[in-house]
């Protein structure tokens, strides 16, 4: 299994079902993978939610890739969440958790 930014049901199930779960960070990365994106349902449709890479290079190992964690990316993710879930139960609590989780100290963060 390679690192993923977003936890999803299949990943959690595989972790729970395994005796030993190994995350590989010494493999090559691919640009259109799920390392930095995931499909999110809401507002009657599915959309890709992506945290962009900074200076992505295919030949780099996953452990050497960085995600763009700038303020503009943070705002984009929060606005994405607001536009799809503002009418959902527990919206305010979930938004608070999201904002806290996105409180990065750097403009780029290592994927691993």
Residue ranges and their predicted role:
Residues 1-112:
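Residues lining hydrophobic/aromatic ligand-binding pockets adjacent to catalytic sites
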């Amino acid at each position: 299994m390679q690192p993923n930014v977003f936890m999803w049901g299949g990943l959690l199930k595989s972790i729970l079902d395994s005796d030993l779960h190994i995350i590989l960070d010494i493999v090559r990365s691919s640009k259109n993978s799920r390392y930095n994106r995931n499909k999110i349902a809401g507002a009657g449709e599915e959309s890709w939610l992506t945290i962009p890479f900074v200076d992505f290079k295919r030949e780099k190992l996953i452990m050497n890739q960085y995600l763009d964690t700038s303020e503009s990316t943070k705002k984009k993710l929060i606005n994405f969440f607001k536009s799809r879930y503002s009418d959902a139960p527990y919206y305010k609590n979930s938004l608070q958790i999201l904002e806290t989780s996105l409180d990065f100290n750097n403009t780029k963060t290592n994927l691993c």
